[in-house]
Amino acid sequence: MVDTSNLLPQTPRLLKVPLIILNIILWILGLVLVIVGGICVSFLSNFKDFTKASDAKSALSNLTTSIPAGVLVIGILFVIFTVVGCFVAYKEKLVGLVIYCAVMLILLVILIGVGGKAITLHNDDIINEVGGAWEHVANGTKNSTLTRLENFLKCCKWSNVSIDSSDLCPKDGDKIKYEGHYCGEALSDQFSSKIYAVGAAGLAIGIIELVAILFSLFLIIRICRSPRTRSYDQY
């Protein structure tokens, strides 16, 4: 039988230092997730009234709340648990490392799920979904929500062939503002930059997190195999 005991460093120190460094990197990236998620939540919060006024509530709410809110929450948890990870690694707390591994593994699954969902969203499908809802709202009683959206996106009408009236466009006196700047194009640019950034950041951080989990598992194994005095604090 192959002896695997020599495959790991002989002292926990050689494992905990890289683990602490990885946690510091993940803490910084957690702040990035908080910032990116906050920007997306702030941007997509402008679609709240529009989502309520449209028939595609479930599809649009998933886009406008689930993904950005998920990224924001994950970022906050990262900031908290990476600090915990640094502490338990430095102190070589065995039980703390086990709990840290379990929590980070759960976060890894969620992060890859959210990041994968964001990065696989097809921009054309999103725009078609929003475009259909846009025309529905334009013909409804709550079409004033479009004026607020157009003012936010600095655009007028969904496209040059859409049926929504330019009467809903923001006006500067009698002059229509943003004429010729269509909302479909403006929204497409915004989604391309924000949603894909969320997905790419999530997957990249997930890879680094996986390495950190492996180091913490190796550290747990090495601590268990290391000789300890009676006063050794394994908790």
Curated annotation (Swiss-Prot):
The gene is tspA. It is found in: Membrane. It comes from Dictyostelium discoideum. One of its GO terms (cellular component) is membrane. It holds the Pfam family Tetraspanin. Glycans are attached at N62, N139, N143, N160. The keyword Membrane applies. It is a multi-pass membrane protein. Its main location: membrane. Keywords: Glycoprotein, Membrane, Transmembrane, Transmembrane helix. The chain crosses the membrane at residues 19-39, 69-89, 94-114, 201-221. Residues 1-18, 90-93, 222-235 are cytoplasmic. This is Probable tetraspanin tspA. InterPro entries: Tetraspanin/Peripherin. Belongs to the tetraspanin (TM4SF) family. Residues 40-68, 115-200 are extracellular. PANTHER family: TETRASPANIN, TETRASPANIN TSPA-RELATED.
